[in-house]
Amino acid sequence: MATIEAIHTATIQVLLADGVGRLTTTRVSERAGVSVGTMYQYYPHKQALLFAIVERQLDLIVRAMLEAAERLEGCDLRTVSDGLATAWLDAKMADLVSSRAIYAIAAEFDLAELMSRAKNLMVEAISPLLRAIPDARFADPDVTAFMLAALLGGTVRVVMEAGSSEDDLERLRQELPRACLGYLKMSACPLCPSDE
């Protein structure tokens, strides 16, 4: 496990220093302090290594969102909105360096399958949560969950890819929950008198 962690850390470092185009398994193995043979034991080529890095990051985000959904079940609309935005930001900002490096990988490789799997898991986590909100109803919680995940992911990506300052990231922490709440309020159907 320590070897894999060293390889992942070295990959991120090489990515950020030199970009995807100059990343090689040899350069990563040198930076990680492992032999090329050891490197190939885990990752037979550059693409396998980069996909593993992306998958690991996506898994962390999905896990954070699943935990948030479990914790927020049955809460009111504002609490759910704020909780999901905060969980997303916490997961993405826990390792800003890795998060930014992932976007470089995404620009170079077709990650549609990995991204689709992550999107489906997010919708599966958020949709039931939206159904359980006592003070809001949604005509199609799956569509609303998809759009909320897109809002979270797209907004954070734009800010991170721009190499934003600490002030920008703090502003994102303040504004993203408001954007999510606004979207959810606009997407909610009026409650029937019997639902209020």
Regions found by a protein language model. Give the residues of each.
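Short linear capping/connector segments at secondary-structure termini
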Residues: 67-70, 101-109
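Amphipathic alpha-helical segments enriched in hydrophobic/aromatic and basic residues
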Residues: 15, 24-25, 46, 50-57, ...
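Amphipathic alpha-helical packing segments from all-alpha helical-bundle domains
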Residues: 56-66, 79-86, 90-94, 109-134, ...
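Basic, helix-initiating cap at the start of DNA-binding domains
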Residues: 1-18, 26-27, 31, 48
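Short hydrophobic/aromatic patch on the recognition helix
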Residues: 33-43
